[in-house]
Amino acid sequence: MNALRLVRTTHAGVADVDVRMMERAIHLARQAALNGEVPIAAVVYRGEEVLAEAANNREAHADPTGHAEIVAMRIAGQKLGEWRLEGCSMAVTLEPCPMCAGALVNARLGRLVYGATDPKAGACETLYSIPCDARLNHRVEMHGGVLAAQCIELLRAFFRERRAAQKAARDARKRSA
């Protein structure tokens, strides 16, 4: 995750509520890390109202679609009784992947606020620009780099600890062999 980087942004269009929702997502991501999940979390909100929040749950549910964005949109849609999330915003700690970016468009999400860019799978700015692709039937307003340093450090710490644990397990196997 050393390639994670800060997005240069003026934060024009980012409101105080967006920062508060990102702080909430960061808190959820920390909890996910404690549960062995990659620390990514998302909050779906309309104005000041939180409609849904979720963290990655791929490991817990053995579900390849258990990304925070997908889970949060599913919960928001159920709460609203509607799959369209028009007028809603999402704060997510990492730039969405192609699957999640496509789901944002399909859900007609109004705005996306994300923290760190994703050099390996980022589909909003880094590798692709799915949410603002004029060829699609909906475009999502995007603001990247919100509290990016905190989001990056959370991911780096998680993977640093994971690598150390994997190395310790390998070393233990070598000693017992």
Residue ranges and their predicted role:
Residues 60-70:
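A short, polar/charged loop-to-alpha-helix boundary motif
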